[in-house]
């Protein structure tokens, strides 16, 4: 049995080694079409006479095996939530190690879950259409048939024809072969990219639109809409190279040549997506104050944890995200000081508590290692793998001591480089590495692996250094009194994240603020019209809990401007409680603005 339950492919019999995506982007029909070539290696000796690939809502038109057209293929019945397996017969099988090339001619359909198409009206300058992909966790199969599992890694060639600039998760080779458009349509160029480091299918990425580019460092570019370019450049140019150099000292040198950032339109559903060469990022990080660039530290860290060393299935997602949060906080500590690591961890602990509360403390999805048989990995997405995963690694670091632990980090990322692993292999690698270190081995004997892996709910809470949050807590305490009169000087000199911690504390009050208190807070601390969504969204949360009607419409307005699920889902849930009608109307009005992944999750939330 393959160890990934979320794929229908028979990847234990055949392995994708190289993928050529020769595709055209059709903005008018909102389709991607063309030919994808999969070079698959036979893992058995003639035992398997069919290749089974994942597909979901893809229109498969024709298939060739080693250059010869075949009719011996069938798209089988849909198996929710995984799609329709595509079976291609290989009569007589193939000797072990033989490479078989499948050329599959496809078109995406309007049910494709990986692509979002924006009309010109949905973009900022309203001049051109835009498209982008989001393949994690199991959405690449809705663009083209593939072995859609993180347990398989392939090198890639991208040849993408589009009337607008294209970016992909490979190194750019440039644009060539202009073709004139017909009937007054725009002409197209062929944009080529290559990826020589094998990567899992969920890191396949495409974007095309009115995209301009500027340098933000010696090996980094930022790409975004022309109007936003200078703001994005300013936001990122101070820290990007510094972050790269910092993490290179913790792990080992950056392997992907360039580290670039594409700032997407506002409907992008995540904070960032660690697509190799081009991190896809939410525009909410461009807040004009450089306060949210930690998202870049996180996505950059994925270049090691997740992209070079990958979880073998989504049941072990903590190996991607826990490690990435751990490395992100190590970058922050090195750049800003150790207290900032704890400060970030305190914010993360609150997010973990929120997730556990939302699922329920006995829920399967609050475990570190989850059972996803028959389940959609998107449904399990929460801060649990991020924060519980971080806490496990932080616990291990404290157990063996930081200088000792720091020797393990490059060893782990070297051992599993360009491979995928599960939690049991992580455990074996760790114990094996420290076997010759008597003190560390002794310390590791106390680890209750079963509880960490399989016990639902919160892990043990460590003692944090609270020096940076104490004043946030102290100010929140003052707000417990109905007589407190706020002043802008209360938060003078604070970072945005300190205001976030203060607002989180206020959200924990057993008795919410009164509407007049909520309004006074918004006014004194300039929280209504801030460009920083981390602040406005949390302030609206406080106001909604206070039943302060003055924030209802601004909340609905924000929900029409931001598509990042972290903000969207939380605000809809809170708006539902106080004004279901407004929540439903706001969703109806904006549902075409949201990404399909976000739209589906909010629809589920509204039904609950």
Curated annotation (Swiss-Prot):
Q: Show the PROSITE patterns listed in the entry.
A: ZINC_PROTEASE
Q: Which domain of life is it from?
A: Eukaryota
Q: Catalytic center at which residues?
A: 299 (proton acceptor), 386 (proton donor)
The catalytic activity, as recorded, is:
an epoxide + H2O = an ethanediol
A Pfam family annotated for this UniProt entry: Peptidase_M1_N
Q: How is the cofactor bound?
A: Binds 1 zinc ion per subunit.
Per the record, GO CC terms?
cytosol; fungal-type vacuole lumen; multivesicular body; nucleus; NVT complex
Fetch the SMART domains from UniProt.
Answer: Leuk-A4-hydro_C
EC number in record: 3.4.11.-, 3.3.2.10
Identify the residues that bind substrate.
134-136, 269-274
Question: What does this protein need as cofactor?
Answer: Zn(2+)
Primary site of residence? cytoplasm
What are the recorded Gene Ontology BP terms? Answer: cytoplasm to vacuole targeting by the NVT pathway; lipid metabolic process; peptide catabolic process; protein catabolic process; proteolysis
The residues the record assigns to binding Zn(2+) are: 298, 302, 321
Which GO terms fall under molecular function for this chain's record? Answer: aminopeptidase activity; epoxide hydrolase activity; metallopeptidase activity; zinc ion binding
Per its UniProt record, what InterPro entries does this chain match?
Aminopeptidase_N-like_N (IPR045357), Aminopeptidase_N-like_N_sf (IPR042097), ARM-type_fold (IPR016024), LTA4H (IPR012777), LTA4H_cat (IPR049980), M1_LTA-4_hydro/amino_C_sf (IPR038502), M1_LTA4H (IPR034015), Peptidase_M1 (IPR001930)
Keywords, A to Z, come to: Cytoplasm, Hydrolase, Metal-binding, Metalloprotease, Nucleus, Protease, Zinc
Q: Where in the cell is it found?
A: Cytoplasm; Nucleus
Would the keyword Nucleotide-binding be found if you checked this record's keyword annotation?
Answer: no
Q: Which family does it belong to?
A: Belongs to the peptidase M1 family.
* Physiological role: Aminopeptidase that preferentially cleaves di- and tripeptides. Also has low epoxide hydrolase activity (in vitro). Can hydrolyze the epoxide leukotriene LTA(4) but it forms preferentially 5,6-dihydroxy-7,9,11,14-eicosatetraenoic acid rather than the cytokine leukotriene B(4) as the product compared to the homologous mammalian enzyme (in vitro).
Q: What is this protein called?
A: Leucine aminopeptidase 2
Where does this protein come from, organism-wise? Sclerotinia sclerotiorum (strain ATCC 18683 / 1980 / Ss-1)
């Amino acid at each position: 049995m393959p160890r990934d339950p979320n794929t229908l492919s028979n990847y234990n019999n055949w392995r994708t080694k190289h993928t050529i995506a020769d595709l055209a982007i059709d903005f008018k029909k909102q389709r991607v079409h063309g030919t994808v070539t999969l070079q698959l290696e036979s893992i058995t000796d003639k035992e398997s006479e069919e290749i089974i690939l994942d597909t979901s809502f893809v229109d498969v038109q024709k298939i060739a095996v080693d250059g010869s057209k075949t009719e011996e293929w069938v798209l089988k019945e849909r198996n929710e939530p995984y799609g329709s397996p595509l079976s291609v017969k290989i009569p007589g099988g193939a000797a072990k190690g033989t490479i078989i090339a499948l050329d599959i001619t496809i078109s995406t359909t309007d049910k494709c879950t990986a692509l979002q198409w924006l009309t010109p009206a949905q973009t900022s300058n309203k001049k051109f259409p835009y498209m982008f992909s989001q393949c994690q966790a199991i959405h690449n199969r809705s663009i083209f048939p593939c072995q859609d599992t993180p347990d398989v890694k392939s090198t890639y060639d991208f040849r993408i024809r589009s009337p607008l600039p294209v970016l992909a998760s490979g190194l750019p080779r440039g644009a060539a072969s202009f073709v004139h458009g017909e009937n007054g349509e725009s002409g197209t160029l062929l944009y080529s990219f290559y990826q020589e480091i094998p990567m899992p299918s969920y890191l396949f990425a495409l974007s095309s639109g009115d995209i301009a580019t500027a340098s933000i460092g010696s090996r980094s570019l930022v790409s975004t809409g022309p109007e936003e370019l200078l703001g994005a450049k300013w936001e990122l140019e101070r820290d990007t190279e510094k972050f790269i150099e910092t993490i290179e000292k913790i792990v080992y040198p950056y392997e992907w040549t360039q580290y670039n950032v594409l700032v997407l339109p506002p409907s992008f559903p995540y904070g960032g997506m660690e697509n190799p060469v081009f991190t896809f990022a939410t525009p909410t990080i461009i807040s004009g104050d450089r306060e949210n660039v930690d998202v870049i530290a996180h996505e950059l860290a994925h270049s090691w944890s997740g992209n070079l060393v990958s979880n073998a299935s989504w049941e072990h997602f903590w190996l991607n995200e826990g490690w990435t949060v751990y490395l992100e906080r190590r970058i922050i500590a090195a750049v800003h000081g150790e207290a900032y690591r704890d400060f970030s961890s305190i914010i993360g602990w609150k997010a973990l508590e929120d997730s556990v509360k939302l699922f329920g403390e006995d829920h399967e999805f609050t475990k570190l290692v989850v059972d996803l048989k028959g389940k959609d990995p998107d449904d399990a997405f929460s801060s649990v793998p991020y924060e519980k995963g971080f806490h496990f690694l932080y616990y291990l670091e404290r157990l063996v001591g930081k200088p000792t632990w720091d020797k393990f980090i490059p060893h782990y990322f070297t051992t599993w480089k360009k491979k995928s692993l599960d939690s049991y292999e992580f455990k074996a690698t760790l114990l094996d590495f420290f076997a010759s270190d008597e003190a560390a081995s002794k310390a590791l004997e106390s680890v209750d692996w079963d509880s960490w892996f399989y016990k639902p709910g919160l892990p043990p809470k460590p003692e944090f250094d609270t020096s940076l949050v104490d004043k946030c807590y102290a100010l929140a305490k003052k707000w417990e009194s109905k007589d407190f009169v706020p002043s802008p000087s209360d938060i003078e000199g604070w970072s945005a994240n300190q205001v976030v911690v203060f607002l989180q504390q206020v959200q924990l009050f057993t008795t919410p603020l009164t509407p007049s208190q909520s309004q006074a807070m918004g006014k004194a601390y300039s929280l209504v019209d801030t460009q920083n969504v981390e602040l406005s969204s949390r302030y609206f949360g406080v106001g909604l809990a206070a039943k302060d009607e003055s924030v209802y419409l601004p909340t609905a307005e924000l929900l029409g401007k931001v598509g990042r699920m972290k903000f969207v889902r939380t605000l809809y849930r809170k708006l539902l409680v106080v004004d279901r009608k407004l929540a439903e109307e706001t969703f109806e009005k904006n549902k075409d603005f949201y990404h399909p992944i976000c739209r589906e999750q909010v629809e589920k939330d509204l039904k609950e």
